[in-house]
Structures are given as C-alpha cells and as structure tokens.
Amino acid sequence: MKRATTFLSLLALSAGLLAQSSVKTERQYLSGRGCDDMVQWDFMCTGGNNSGKWAKIGVPSCWELQGFGTYQYGMKFYGKAFPEGVADEQGLYKYEFELPAEWNGKQIELVFEGSMTDTQVKINGRKAGSMHQGAFYRFIYNVSDRVFFGSKKKECS
C-alpha cells in the first residue's frame, strides 16, 4: 500500500511538472540589456544639468553619466540625514510601446531588474502598483488590467 501511495504521489507530481512546462513565457524588452544596446526613452530630470525639459536617454543607464542632473560621486555625506549639496532631483521616464495582439487575455507583467531608490510606475496613466522602495533588485508589476489592446499606444512612465 505504501508503494502504491508513493507511486501515485510521484505520478501526480510528474503530471504537474509536465503541465507547467507547457506554459510559455514570452518577453518583449522595453529597455536594452546593457550599455551595448540601450533603448531610447523620453526623459526629464527635475534638477541639475539639462533639467526641466524632455530629452532622450538610453535605458538602462545612469542619468548623470549621460549629462543630466547633478554629478556628485565622491562627496563625503555618509552618516548625515540630508547634507547640503546632495542632489534631490528626480528622473521622469516615458516610453510608448505596442504589445502583440495574441497577448490579449494573458497575464502581462512589467519586470524591472533594478532601479535606484524610490520608483513609482504608471502604465497608461494608472499606477502599476505600490511604490518600489529599495535599491537594485528585481521587482514586478502585473499590469494585465492596465494595458488596452486595439490601440497602438501603451505608455510606461
């Protein structure tokens, strides 16, 4: 009896694994995968160099290295709450994209591999979820109810 129970348990587990393997994940990158293949997004920095106007910026990147904001590397501000001279600008990003029509009715997720500090994401003008607070680690938003098929414009900001 014990062997039969073990066999049936293994059989059920195997069937579950086979069923899971039939699910196909499709990807559409909205950014590049590194400095060799950046994708141009609309960008505005709220302070520092080249601020207050929309421009193009490669994503992924560091905006200071592309001439925006306040370059502040090497400043001695550790251990202070908010010392004088530390930049407090924000970067605003926008990107329009289309999704394949065959994705309609499927789960759509925006996956971020990393973002420095606080990140609020909107898709077509609606918040994708709660604000990401942290550093360079992966976070994901399910935006299935925020994308509209049949229109060409999808905006992530």
Task: Identify the role of each PLM range.
Residues 1, 52-55, 75, 123, ...:
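Generic cytosolic/nucleocytoplasmic N-terminal low-complexity/intrinsically disordered segments
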Residues 1-25:
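Bacterial Sec-dependent N-terminal signal peptides
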Residues 6-7, 28-31, 142:
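General helical structural elements
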Residues 15-16, 37, 151:
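Generic detector of short, well-ordered, non-transmembrane alpha-helical segments enriched
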Residues 44-48, 88-157:
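Accessory beta-strand-rich segments of carbohydrate-active enzymes
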